[in-house]
Swiss-Prot record:
The keyword Chaperone applies. This is T-complex protein 1 subunit eta. Belongs to the TCP-1 chaperonin family. ATP binds at G41, G93, S96, R398, G409, R499. It comes from Gallus gallus.
């Protein structure tokens, strides 16, 4: 008699296991890498991505492209996640980390197909990653922080390297100086949120400027605004989350009055409440009033009569940055506007930039802050410029905190590849083959730089292997002359932490995907829609929703 089969998973559950599904996962990661492969390096191409709402984005930043792609394959999502983590941690190297992870998987695919146990692959990869990280730390060049000129030169070169692969690479000298100035203006914590980036359409890229303080676009204002002064020396600043305007009653509000005098008393009370708030703000000594909520026409004219400046509907991010820079605190009431809760700055002024007016707070005493005002033509171009500057700012912050650098342009990858290949010859067994595969995978970076520039990759990689074998450890791809060059002498520098982070993240992602031996996809549960009602509350009783089934593995 046949035993009764045990049905564990719900009907329709998709399960795949063994070598075929592991190979399928590796192939999915290859497809993700193909999407960003051509964006690597100074000769990389850009991608035009249109989302479901029709918004177009032009970018060659790996993390941005992968965020915008609606990836559904669960294994491929791992590569998207490591690109995001690289972007959040160090800002640059997002395309490199995706390519490395995909190439590690590609190199071990033959071993997987032959039935080599995944744990042997994982052990070899972890050994190779540890050796590579230690090698980077050994050969990285440290820059003395005591010599400010040398440190500044290092930071500018790191920023220029990060910008050389971007859309604004023609202006990398201009922007690398601006980025270094911006980061140097911050205090020791180097908080990213203390650097604001504002975009103003019109003008050339070189019209962009750095403001040593807080700047934001003038908000919507009512009649009477033109009478207010637009410049103050050492003003006190009131930061509010209070509505200063007369508003219509809420829906379904009802006031019953018997006489006209009663109605007049209600109207007078509303005006008195508003004027009472305005008087308290005026008596506090504040000359600049910023509020997250609207400031109406009555309040605007009241402040104009008393030589005060006001701005309502200020974005929360700008209000918080002003508070952190100028001191004080955001008040939800005007009853306790003492000197302690008012902010201060050396100079407040409103300036015309392009077609917009901007409010500037400079000489802020509390926290050092700055704002980059970008100029340019198309909106997509300016958004990509903002993303490029974000990457450069992150790189400069990392270089200040970790002051060791390595040469870019594929130089460090070729040196690690040679080092691991030499090491693999000293050990026996399967580990030798796997560490050799890891070493070969590292060559994807210089190879892809050559392919993207239209060079003969095989010829240049042969030259690089020969040069590194002779001890030229900083030799990498020279994209300007279709040759190899000492990239340390050519000032193509990157913080060592960027490469370390990329290697460890790519290796961990590859190990994670290799360690998955079964994929189980639950079927989507179909939920019955409740029947339509007949009028308000007079229909049939709606059926309760069924809970979603969860399959067990």
């Amino acid at each position: 008699m046949m035993p009764t089969p045990v049905i564990l998973l719900k009907e329709g559950t998709d399960t795949s296991q063994g070598i075929p599904q592991l190979v399928s996962n590796i192939n999915a990661c290859q497809v993700i890498a193909e999407a960003v492969r051509t964006t690597l390096g100074p000769r990389g191409m850009d991608k035009l991505i249109v989302d479901d709402r029709g918004k177009a984005t032009i970018s060659n930043d790996g993390a941005t492209i992968l965020k915008l792609l609606d990836v559904v394959h669960p294994a491929a999502k791992t590569l998207v996640d490591i690109a995001k983590s690289q972007d959040a941690e160090v800002g640059d190297g997002t395309t490199s980390v995706t390519l490395l992870a995909a190439e590690f998987l590609k190199q071990v695919k033959p071993y997987v197909e032959e039935g080599l146990h995944p744990q042997i692959i994982i052990r070899a990869f972890r050994t190779a990653t540890q050796l590579a990280v230690n090698k980077i730390k050994d050969i990285a060049v440290s820059v003395k922080k005591e010599d400010k000129d040398e440190q500044r030169s290092l930071l500018e070169k790191c920023a220029a390297t990060a910008l050389s692969s971007k859309l604004i690479s023609q202006s990398k000298e201009f922007f690398s100086k601006m980025v270094v100035d911006a980061v140097m203006m911050l205090d020791d914590l180097l908080q990213l949120k203390m650097i604001g980036i504002k975009k103003v359409q019109g003008g050339a890229l070189e019209d962009s400027q750095l403001v040593a303080g807080v700047a934001f676009k003038k908000t919507f204002s009512y009649a009477g605004f033109e009478m207010q002064p637009k410049k103050y020396q050492s003003p006190k600043i009131a930061l509010l989350n209070v509505e200063l305007e007369l508003k219509a009653e809420k829906d379904n509000a009802e006031v019953r009055v018997n006489t006209v005098e009663d109605y007049q008393a209600i109207v007078d009370a509303e005006w008195n409440i508003l004027y009472d708030k305005l008087d308290k703000i005026h008596k506090s000594g504040a000359k600049v009033v910023l509020s997250k909520l609207p400031i109406g026409d009555v309040a605007t004219q009241y402040f104009a009569d008393r030589d005060m400046f006001c701005a309502g509907r200020v974005p929360e991010e700008d209000l918080k940055r002003t508070m952190m820079a100028c001191g004080g605190s955001i008040q939800t009431s005007v009853n306790a506007l003492s000197d302690d809760v008012l902010g201060r700055c050396e100079l407040f002024e409103e300036i015309q930039i392009g077609g917009d007016r901007y409010n500037f707070f400079t000489g802020c005493p509390k926290a050092k802050t700055c704002t980059i005002i970008l100029r340019g033509g198309a909106e997509q171009f300016m958004e990509e410029t903002e993303r490029s500057l974000h990457d450069a700012i992150m790189i400069v912050r990392r270089a200040i905190k970790n002051d060791s650098v390595v040469a870019g342009g594929g130089a460090i990858e070729m040196e690690l590849s040679k080092y691991l290949r030499d090491y693999s010859r000293t050990i026996p067994g399967k580990q030798q083959l796997l560490i050799g595969a890891y070493a070969k995978a590292l060559e994807i970076i210089p190879r892809q730089l050559c392919d993207n520039a239209g060079f003969d990759a095989t010829n240049i990689l042969n030259k690089l292997r020969a040069k590194h074998a002779q001890g030229g450890m900083w030799y990498g791809v020279d994209v300007n002359n279709e040759d190899i060059a000492d990239n340390f002498e050519a000032c193509v520098w990157e913080p060592a932490i960027v490469r370390i982070n990329a290697l460890t993240a790519a290796s961990e992602a590859a190990c994670l995907i290799v360690s998955v031996d079964e994929t189980i996809k639950n079927p989507r549960s179909t939920v019955d829609a409740p029947p339509g009602g007949r009028g308000r509350g007079r229909g049939q009783t709606p059926q309760p929703l069924r809970p979603r089934s969860v399959a067990l593995s």
